[in-house]
Amino acid sequence: VPPETKGAPHAPKGLPPKAKIDVKHVIIVLSGKGGVGKSTVSTNLASALAAHGRQVGLLDLDIHGPNIPKMLGIEDQRPAVLENHMEPVHVTGNLAVMSMAFLLPDTSSPVIWRGPMKMAAIQQFLSEVNWGSLDYLIVDLPPGTGDEALSIVQLAPNVQGAVIVTTPQDVAVL
């Protein structure tokens, strides 16, 4: 490591730098297919951590089918925009949520984005949302192992683990 970069957080060559957010633990929640309860697990995990006094962010990265706001009854809320940052929607004093659903004029309209647009959205959700100081950031991902899962692992600091949600059917683990 060159002396000028020793001790400085940096991404391996060719990868974008990690987002500069104050979070101790990032936990991603993913599944091999849809409809297995991934968003329910994400919501319950975030709610349980918040109920135990932790500062928690819940990031809904299911860009094509965001439903965390609906599950929490906050689908009519919108994040405030202050200067160049968005304020996440607060469910409680220590549980904040950000989702593409807050930014769409109509959540029934499909979002058809390719890799670079998804990567840019994920970078914005990490860097341009005023998360404050978090103990946990729970990231609800879309089904599969596509761009969102790869991007969040590349961009988020302190990714501590993953919860893989499945059901006891053969097709759920493909």
Regions found by a protein language model. Give the residues of each.
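Short, ordered loop/turn segments at secondary-structure junctions
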Residues: 34, 61-64, 102-103, 143-144, ...
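Amphipathic alpha-helical transducer elements in NTP-driven molecular machines
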Residues: 20, 65, 115-123, 146-149, ...
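Conserved catalytic-core segment of NTP-binding enzymes
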Residues: 131, 135-174
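Short, well-ordered alpha-helices that flank and scaffold nucleotide-derived cofactor binding pockets
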Residues: 47, 51, 127, 154
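Extreme N-terminal, non-catalytic leader segments
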Residues: 1-36, 77
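Walker A/P-loop phosphate-binding motif and the immediately C-terminal alpha-helix
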Residues: 25-63
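Short glycine/serine/threonine-rich phosphate/pyrophosphate-binding segments
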Residues: 36-44, 66-69, 144-149, 172-174
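Phosphate-binding loop that captures ATP/GTP phosphates
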Residues: 55-108, 112, 119-121, 126
